[in-house]
Amino acid sequence: MKRYFTNITSNLLLATAFAWIAFGQHAYSQQATATQVVMLRVMELNKIDLVGGPLTLQINSINDNAAQPNPAIDASTKLLWTSNGDARKIAVGSDIASPRFILKIEAEKSSSGGGIAEPEVTLSDNAPHDLILGVQRSAGSCQLKFTAIADVKQGTGEESRLITYTITGG
């Protein structure tokens, strides 16, 4: 009888070990965990664009009262901007240091997307001039009004200018 219980005990231990090996690993397995640090970095993003092609401002009439040429005006260009930066401004500049004729630019009908338009800017040199201030974390737009002015003393001629718009600190 002693041998019978010994075999039962041995068989029971073997059966338990087999069951643990076969099924117990799933029931008693340890979970594995891995961690990762993810850095999110958003860089300052500025975009500026123009809707409208090249312009030709033609002065071709005289003001009868002042005996001076009437200015040529065009407001068909739209300026669009987006910036996620703080305290930005939009500056405008020309590539001509000493222009012969006067060109003025005014930002009109500014959208609610941020920015305050400065008064009309005269491009009398090639330095940048503030056009819109207070652009901050926004997308906005405005119409650009160009005014070309000539004096009779300046005579006739053509002058082509490359106008540059820049979002910058300010």
PLM feature spans:
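C-terminal segment of classical bacterial N-terminal signal peptides
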Residues: 18-28
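Bacterial N-terminal signal peptides that target proteins for export
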Residues: 2-14
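N-terminal small/polar-rich segments of proteins
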Residues: 28-116, 121-170
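Charged interaction patches that mediate protein-protein contacts
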Residues: 1-2, 22
